[in-house]
Amino acid sequence: MMRQEELPMVAMASMNDTHLEEMILINKISEAVVQKDEEKVTVLLDALLQHTIEHFGGEEEMMRQKRFPPYPMHKGEHDRALGELRNVVALWNEQHDFASLARYIGETLPQWIVQHIRTMDTATANFLAGVVSPCSQGHC
């Protein structure tokens, strides 16, 4: 289970809110996996996929509007992570493998989220909020 204290905060409240919503969904999926509730897991995984699509799309739109210099790199990481999530959802829908899903939801995804927020989202939020240029942090 992820704890709110584990989520790094960035310079934009809207991004922090989105990350918190994602953490809550991940925790609900973790609970459903522990309970071996296939139907609930399926519904929640679909919700996480939709939330992630909207989350990444919103960030990417802000980056394009503000002409964020490392946009292609950030978008590429979103595409990779979204592809991985789609694969996890497809595998779940085919096999209902609780053990594989538990590893992804309990380890892989939370670790990626924290790392992504600490690096790419922090630089992005700082730029979008006018705090600092990503180029001054070596991201260009």
Explain the meaning of each model-derived region:
Residues 1-140:
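Small-residue-biased structural context
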